[in-house]
């Protein structure tokens, strides 16, 4: 009996290594702060092949979804759903942007040149190719975090009160607004101002419903202005 209990505990620990356990304090979505100073259009990033710097101002008038991604995470399957989301909502002005990061459980260990082949042949595999732009691997938290992520995080409250298990988080210093895990999402409106932030466990179907609801509100406001 003792051995069975020990094995059960070990299994739980191993499974926990792939994805942080859910907490009662988690919220699926948070609305961003009003009166934010600046816009995302002040920033930009290098594409995953390092060949092009894309200024985010090229997305003026678009709804832009920022996602920090990883190839060896329990949530890597979200890539398939994100492709579907991009395809479905692109006609309405949605643009997805993916930012590989290795700060959560060391789940994006490869070089930039290895990430797309890994997605194609390993996880999700089956010839998968993202239909949205991926950028160079970089930090989203800590001393060397990318500046646009500083802007996004300062614009939106966190979706969880707790950061998680410190031995699986690889950055310093840790701050209350930090991203908690792979596949957190931020939506930026057509004016470049952050609108919503989603917990990494929030389903893509719920993210889609939230985005569509926001798009409808924006459309209604546009009609009223006319």
From Swiss-Prot:
It comes from the Eukaryota. One of its GO terms (molecular function) is selenium binding. Expressed intensively in the kidney and adrenal gland, and weakly in the cerebellum, heart, and lung. Secreted in plasma. It catalyses: 2 glutathione + H2O2 = glutathione disulfide + 2 H2O; tert-butyl hydroperoxide + 2 glutathione = tert-butanol + glutathione disulfide + H2O. InterPro entries: Glutathione_peroxidase, GPX_AS, GPX_CS, Thioredoxin-like_sf. The keyword RNA-binding does not apply. Its EC number is 1.11.1.9. It is an enzyme of class 1 (oxidoreductase). Gene3D superfamilies: Glutaredoxin. It is found in: Secreted. Pfam families: GSHPx. The keyword ATP-binding does not apply. This is Glutathione peroxidase 3. It comes from Macaca fuscata fuscata.
């Amino acid at each position: 009996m003792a051995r069975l209990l020990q094995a059960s505990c070990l299994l739980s620990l191993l499974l926990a290594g792939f994805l942080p356990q859910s907490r009662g304090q988690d919220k699926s979505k948070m609305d961003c702060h009003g009166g934010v100073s600046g816009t995302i259009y002040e920033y930009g990033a290098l594409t995953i092949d390092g060949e092009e710097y894309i200024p985010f101002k090229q997305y003026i008038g678009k709804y832009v979804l920022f996602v920090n991604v990883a190839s060896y995470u329990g949530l890597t399957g979200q890539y398939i759903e994100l492709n579907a989301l991009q395809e479905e909502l692109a006609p309405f002005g949605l643009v997805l942007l993916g930012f590989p990061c290795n700060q959560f459980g060391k789940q994006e260990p490869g070089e930039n040149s290895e990430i797309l082949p890994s997605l194609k042949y390993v996880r999700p595999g089956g010839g998968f190719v993202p239909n949205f732009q991926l950028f160079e691997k970089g930090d989203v938290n800590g001393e060397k975090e990318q500046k646009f992520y500083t802007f996004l995080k300062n614009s939106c409250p966190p979706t969880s009160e707790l950061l998680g298990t410190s031995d699986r988080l690889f950055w310093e210093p840790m701050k209350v607004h930090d991203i908690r895990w792979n596949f957190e999402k931020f939506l930026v409106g057509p004016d470049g101002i952050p609108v919503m932030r989603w917990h990494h466990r929030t389903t893509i179907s719920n993210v889609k419903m939230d985005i569509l609801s926001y798009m409808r509100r924006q459309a209604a406001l546009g009609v009223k202005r006319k």
